[in-house]
Amino acid sequence: MNKKWQWLVYGWKLIILTLLTAAVFSYAMFQGGFVSWFLFYAFLPFVLYAGLLALYPLRSFQASRQMDKTQLHAGDRLGVTVTLRRKLPFPLMYMVIEDCLPEGIESLNRDGAAAKRLVFPWFKRSMTMSYELARVPRGEHHFHSVRVRTGDVLGLIEKTAFFELDDTLFVYPFYQRFSYQVNERHQEDGVSGSSPIHQHHSSVAASVRNYQPGDRFAALDWKTSARRSQLMTKEFEPSRSKNLFLLMDRFSSDAFEEVVSVTASILHSVLKNGAGAGLASIGKEKNIFPIQEGDQHFKHMLRHLAIAHCDAADPISRYAREELGKPSVRQADQVVVTGQLTEDMLHLAEIGGGRVTVILAKEKDAELSQAENVMIERMMKRQIRVRIMRGGRVSRVV
């Protein structure tokens, strides 16, 4: 329907142009004299240009888009260059070039000024538009097309063309490494345990497996590797005090971006210190990453965090018992990252047996509400440890 309307408007403008030309010519024929013919000949170049522009194939341009990078982190800058080339050097008085931004980026740039430029090509065979997007949001963004618009001086003829250019920009969440220390507790043998990132591997290897990219150099089993003529990695008995399992709250929250950023930072910090980490992220789809070690494992989780949405239908407590109660998770430190504290989180004390740490992710300058302070006090009485993290940094521990 929209295309039909555009063609109707375009046809109507051509009719108006024809009628104006006929009117000026008729005036010159019947009136005669210098003034009337001067008006006709002065108007004639505009008519000829508009007629030629109407016939000019704007789709004959060749368009290309070049991005500085196709993988970024949230908050990074993105530089984009759009180039148009043509073979027929028809004089175009002006041209508006616009890169149609993906919905996730366009919402932060509502006027579209950053990705739109007015150029004056005339006879140029090549036109270039460069722009920069500041603070690109997390997610997978698909660029689909470039729009080009031009017209005549009188504004009677306007032509628009779309060039399909498919590019994908993958923006990972922002994360940083920090000294993360989970809830202190006593192990069954009576030794006090602290952060899993400060613990070491068990000295007894349970088995060996094929080497995977990201495995630590110290974990290689050289004897077995020599016998089998391929690199083998030792697998140790899981240490109760060195692993961490994180449950990310994907229920609707204004601080969801902070939740994702804090989750990525914790996983990165734990894995970089030689510990194992796992992740449960449940929304419309259920994504479980079992406790493992290595950079490759972190990349898999980070890629999921880049496209995760706050689309959980139920509060986190609805599935916390199932995920935190699994045998493979019971031996690990359990962390829940959320953007809001709710009444049902008080039941975490029953689930984790005193080992669950709740991290409330807040924006950098956000203050705790009265309801949140009350909920924190109630959780303290239930022996649930709560941490408040603002901008990826611990600002309060209770």
UniProtKB/Swiss-Prot annotation:
Pfam families, alphabetized: DUF58
InterPro entries on file: DUF58
Identification of the protein by name: Uncharacterized protein YeaD
Organism: Bacillus subtilis (strain 168)
Lineage of origin: Bacteria, Bacillati, Bacillota, Bacilli, Bacillales
Gene: yeaD
